[in-house]
């Protein structure tokens, strides 16, 4: 079984990789595709789905991070956010999510509250 430092490094490393792949995909997406509708879901564009990722993170941060002092970034407009602004917003929400993950990994009280013991995975 991995020790706590291994678990912490693995989870935070996986988060950073996920965010990097997401932001690079958005940066490299051809502009012609940005506002295309998803087949059979005409109200959902690639822009809207990408913005939803950031806005969902904001919801998690507001719900779980506020009481721990983790700031919630501003949400973005799913219909109008330009790619560059979305990438900047994703970087802010990623930093918050990383702080939230670190909080959960580092706070023994949270482990006890959720798992009933201090034994780490």
Model-derived segments and spans:
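Aromatic-glycine hotspot motif
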Residues: 1-121
């Amino acid at each position: 079984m991995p020790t706590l430092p291994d678990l912490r490094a693995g989870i935070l490393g996986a988060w950073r990789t996920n965010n990097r792949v997401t932001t690079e995909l958005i940066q490299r997406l051809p502009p012609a595709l940005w506002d295309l509708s998803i087949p059979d879901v005409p109200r959902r564009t690639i822009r809207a789905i990408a913005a939803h990722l950031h806005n969902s993170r904001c919801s998690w941060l507001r719900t779980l991070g506020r009481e721990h002092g983790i700031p919630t970034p501003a949400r973005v407009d799913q219909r109008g956010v330009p790619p560059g602004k979305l990438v900047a917003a994703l970087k802010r929400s990623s930093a918050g999510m990383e702080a939230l993950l670190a909080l959960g990994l580092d706070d023994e009280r949270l482990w006890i509250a959720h798992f009933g013991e201090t034994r780490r995975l």
